[in-house]
C-alpha cells in the first residue's frame, strides 16, 4: 500500500530549526536515527513525504532586529538553507517537489 505523510519534523531537527532536545547522532535525510529517513521511506513503500521547514522567528531577533523587521529575512534565509540541505539528499527516489507537476 502506498501512503503519504503530510508532516515530518526530521528536516527541521537535522538543520537545527527546531529545538527539540533530540540528539542528532547519525544525521542526514538519507539515513538518520530519528523517525524518518529516505532509506526507511523506500523500504516502507511511501509514495511521498512532506518535510516541515519550521523556524521560531524569535530565535533570530534582538532589539535592533525586532525594530527593523529583519527577523523575517533571517527566518526566511534559514528556511532556504533547509531546502538546500534537502536538495543535497535528492536521488532517483527522493526529490524536492516545488509544484503540483513535480
Q: What are the functions of these language-model segments?
A:
Residues 1-102:
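N-terminal hydrophobic targeting/anchoring segments and the immediately downstream early-domain regions
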Amino acid at each position: 500500500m502506498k501512503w503519504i505523510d503530510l508532516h515530518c519534523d526530521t528536516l527541521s531537527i537535522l538543520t537545527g530549526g527546531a529545538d527539540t532536545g533530540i540528539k542528532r547522532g547519525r544525521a542526514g535525510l538519507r539515513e538518520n536515527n530519528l523517525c524518518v529517513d529516505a532509506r526507511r521511506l523506500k523500504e516502507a513503500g511511501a509514495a511521498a513525504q512532506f518535510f516541515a521547514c519550521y523556524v521560531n522567528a524569535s530565535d533570530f531577533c534582538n532589539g535592533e532586529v525586532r525594530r527593523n523587521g529583519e527577523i523575517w529575512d533571517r527566518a526566511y534565509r534559514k528556511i532556504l538553507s533547509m531546502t538546500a540541505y534537502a536538495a543535497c539528499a535528492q536521488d532517483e527516489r527522493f526529490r524536492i517537489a516545488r509544484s503540483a507537476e513535480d
